[in-house]
Amino acid sequence: MNEQGFTDDVYERLRGICTAVAVLAGDAAPESTLTGPVAFVSAGRVSVVVDAEAGRRRTIALLQEGDALVLPAGGWPGAPGARVRAATDAELLVLNREIGDVLCSDAGLGAWIVRAMASAVADRELSVAIALEPRLERRLVLKLRQLADRWGKVTPEGVRLDLRVTHQELGDMIGAARESITVALGRLQDQGEIIVRRRTVIIRRMDDQDGTATDTA
């Protein structure tokens, strides 16, 4: 989750203890550069992708500016071959020291890093739970709610998601073909779950209770 408080001050303090890694759109970050316990997206948008069955690609995390990317030693559990790919030109700040050392030298920044890492782990666990849903439309609406909870804006109609992800990117996140996503979005709109306007999606309900998203947002 995008950790609140990713201010210019935090950015400058992170640069003092991190190695900056620039990644061009469409490229993968070299594994040799991702050697710290955690990295932070300081610019652009990146995803963590793995190769799935039948030559498909699966996105297991989508990250934007301020998001933390926990880098487990030996790779991502259950996701062999995972790589960090830039959806746009991006910059990562890879922590080049132990978390404990940061807590000792800058307790405030260390606490911020720990919160950001906890949010990242919680978001990953939610993504895993969504992936286990058997029905495509259910997986899709849960994923849209997850994205809207992180990046959406409350409007009178619901929570507006202006993330500008493509149908292919949504499909990669929940294990579905692009064509299936297009059909599922249409069905969700017919059911009143969402409103689709070009590449903007408005999520009418952020949970399974009756009423629009603005009732609880």
Can you name each region flagged by the protein language model?
Residues D149-A217:
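Phosphate-/nucleic-acid-contacting segments
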